[in-house]
Amino acid sequence: MERLVFCVLVFGALAKAQLCPGRCICQTISPTLTLLCAKTGLLFVPPTVDRKTVELRLTDNFITAVRRKDFLNMTSLVHLTLSRNTISQIAPHAFMGLKSLRALHMDGNRLSVINSDQLKGLMNLRHLILGNNQIHHIEESSFDEFVATIEDLDLSYNNLRTLPWEAIARMTNINTLTLDHNLIDHIGVGTFTLLTKLVRLDMTSNRLQTLPPDTLFQHAQVLSEPKTSSSSRLTVSFGGNPLHCNCELLWLRRLTREDDLETCASPEHLMDKYFWSIQEEEFICEPPLITKHQVTKPYVMEGQGVTLKCKAMGDPDPAIHWRFPDGKLVHNNSRTILYDNGTLDILITTLKDSGAFNCVASNAAGIATAAVHVHMIPLPLLVNNTGHMREADPGLSDISTSSRSSSNDSKTHSKRVLVENLTAHSAVIHWPSERHIPGIRMYQIQYELCVLAVYDDGITSLTATRVVGCVHFHTLPETNQCRFVPSQFLGGTMIIIIGGIIVASVLVFIIILMIRYKAYSGGGGDTAKAKAGGDVSVHVHSQTNGSRSAATKQSEEPPESPAGKHCKALVLLKMVLPILHLLF
């Protein structure tokens, strides 16, 4: 019997020894279990940790990551310390299930980003220590799990430029907020209004130039260096910031001071002066002054884009916004883009944009406005032969857009424009005269061989364009060009050719002299008369006169009716622009 009891005790001791990792200290003080594994050279969280552990300390090791399985089912864990390791990664939901955890210490690691899913499950967390890391970004919802329970938040000695201020503003139970030695340059207005239990706010050694006034600071004690303070009064530490001493910090100057160690960094006349020694009258601001307001182009065609610019100066730097001609405030959307430097881009203009845009510059000292005028040019409306408004025909406005026409449009207009007499260098194009369109000034032929009628619109007095038709064709293959003379024909052959040319020239000169001699000797012969005949045509480059055929010989045929009259153009394809022969 005694031997059986001894065996049971031995097996129990061995079982407990297996649950405690090597080189770790396991302390069992009923009903709690504490596991201490400091400076043991751990590379990861030991998998043999008792799942009923209440306090787990793994400080001064070489753990590089927190895995999802490391703290699985450890629902009794209350205090977790992972300080001074080399942790750079936290797996998503790595702390899920730790509903009893009250304190998490991860200072002195290599964390760079805190994502929203890395701290999930810590619904009862009260102390979060993340100081001495390399954190430069914290997602907005990272603290949402414990925003109502957190009491101590330490983010000191990181690379933070901003914080999830909206989440911090909801931490109504927080007592200590430590944000010193970061790169923070802005604090949202009203961030601390609801933090009535806040006892200590440490903003030492950041890049703050100003602090927003807050009702919570009315009874605050201001310190330039962290010191002990009573629990009943808020202590604000802001030493080591490049304070800009203007009217925005006048509220801080009126608070109770404890020493004269803090100085101003700007403006220039207050540089290096003790903050608390400056008179209240010297904390002044300058109203905004608009130095530049202009538009890239004052006249804008409807649908085009335009850029408006506005610059202003003042102390503090004024914020710039714009108002439409109807007085509405301009916001960023798919049509308008407003930049921080005061530039406004309108990507697509409408007729409602015609008028005066107002640039408004404002700061703590006042408001300044300036008007920028934009004149909208409406798109031309086409008129049919009945005098009623109609939509413009979808067509090409210039050569560069000719390739954008759809195949359906090409098929529709190809029946109205015909091509004939195709050669390697030219083609003759026929199209209707379009006499029913009033005021046609010319016909424009483009590289895609689409004929456009350009005329004056009767209502808007603007130039309108209508596609008469398009045609597609292929020219005939070009004949072979002259080949280069082989080298064997040069030399003596060239001398013979040159000599022949000289002899021929002498013979021609002799024949001319003989003809002149006979002409003078004939005396009184009939004078030869030249008779001009044949068709005369004029080359016109790129565009033709649609109203009349100038510089052409009038035909003796009877005139045709206007409805049946056709136009014709000869296109010389070797030219950079088409050369047209107008035949009416």
UniProtKB/Swiss-Prot annotation:
<feature type="glycosylation site" description="N-linked (GlcNAc...) asparagine">
    <location>
        <position position="408"/>
    </location>
</feature>
<keyword id="KW-0472">Membrane</keyword>
<feature type="glycosylation site" description="N-linked (GlcNAc...) asparagine">
    <location>
        <position position="341"/>
    </location>
</feature>
<dbReference type="GO" id="GO:0045202">
    <property type="term" value="C:synapse"/>
</dbReference>
<dbReference type="GO" id="GO:0016020">
    <property type="term" value="C:membrane"/>
</dbReference>
<keyword id="KW-1133">Transmembrane helix</keyword>
<feature type="region of interest" description="Disordered">
    <location>
        <begin position="539"/>
        <end position="564"/>
    </location>
</feature>
<feature type="domain" description="LRRNT">
    <location>
        <begin position="18"/>
        <end position="51"/>
    </location>
</feature>
<keyword id="KW-0393">Immunoglobulin domain</keyword>
<feature type="repeat" description="LRR 3">
    <location>
        <begin position="100"/>
        <end position="121"/>
    </location>
</feature>
<feature type="glycosylation site" description="N-linked (GlcNAc...) asparagine">
    <location>
        <position position="73"/>
    </location>
</feature>
<feature type="repeat" description="LRR 5">
    <location>
        <begin position="149"/>
        <end position="170"/>
    </location>
</feature>
<keyword id="KW-0433">Leucine-rich repeat</keyword>
<dbReference type="InterPro" id="IPR003591">
    <property type="entry name" value="Leu-rich_rpt_typical-subtyp"/>
</dbReference>
<feature type="transmembrane region" description="Helical">
    <location>
        <begin position="495"/>
        <end position="515"/>
    </location>
</feature>
<comment type="function">
    <text>Involved in the regulation of excitatory synapses.</text>
</comment>
<feature type="topological domain" description="Extracellular">
    <location>
        <begin position="18"/>
        <end position="494"/>
    </location>
</feature>
<keyword id="KW-0325">Glycoprotein</keyword>
<feature type="domain" description="Ig-like">
    <location>
        <begin position="288"/>
        <end position="375"/>
    </location>
</feature>
<feature type="repeat" description="LRR 6">
    <location>
        <begin position="173"/>
        <end position="194"/>
    </location>
</feature>
<keyword id="KW-0770">Synapse</keyword>
<feature type="repeat" description="LRR 4">
    <location>
        <begin position="124"/>
        <end position="145"/>
    </location>
</feature>
<dbReference type="InterPro" id="IPR013783">
    <property type="entry name" value="Ig-like_fold"/>
</dbReference>
<dbReference type="Pfam" id="PF13927">
    <property type="entry name" value="Ig_3"/>
</dbReference>
<feature type="glycosylation site" description="N-linked (GlcNAc...) asparagine">
    <location>
        <position position="384"/>
    </location>
</feature>
<keyword id="KW-0677">Repeat</keyword>
<feature type="repeat" description="LRR 7">
    <location>
        <begin position="197"/>
        <end position="218"/>
    </location>
</feature>
<comment type="similarity">
    <text>Belongs to the LRFN family.</text>
</comment>
<protein>
    <recommendedName>
        <fullName>Leucine-rich repeat and fibronectin type III domain-containing protein 1</fullName>
    </recommendedName>
</protein>
<dbReference type="InterPro" id="IPR007110">
    <property type="entry name" value="Ig-like_dom"/>
</dbReference>
<feature type="signal peptide">
    <location>
        <begin position="1"/>
        <end position="17"/>
    </location>
</feature>
<dbReference type="InterPro" id="IPR036179">
    <property type="entry name" value="Ig-like_dom_sf"/>
</dbReference>
<dbReference type="InterPro" id="IPR003598">
    <property type="entry name" value="Ig_sub2"/>
</dbReference>
<dbReference type="InterPro" id="IPR003599">
    <property type="entry name" value="Ig_sub"/>
</dbReference>
<dbReference type="Pfam" id="PF13855">
    <property type="entry name" value="LRR_8"/>
</dbReference>
<keyword id="KW-0732">Signal</keyword>
<feature type="compositionally biased region" description="Polar residues">
    <location>
        <begin position="540"/>
        <end position="553"/>
    </location>
</feature>
<feature type="domain" description="LRRCT">
    <location>
        <begin position="241"/>
        <end position="287"/>
    </location>
</feature>
<feature type="repeat" description="LRR 1">
    <location>
        <begin position="52"/>
        <end position="73"/>
    </location>
</feature>
<feature type="compositionally biased region" description="Low complexity">
    <location>
        <begin position="397"/>
        <end position="409"/>
    </location>
</feature>
<feature type="disulfide bond">
    <location>
        <begin position="310"/>
        <end position="359"/>
    </location>
</feature>
<feature type="glycosylation site" description="N-linked (GlcNAc...) asparagine">
    <location>
        <position position="332"/>
    </location>
</feature>
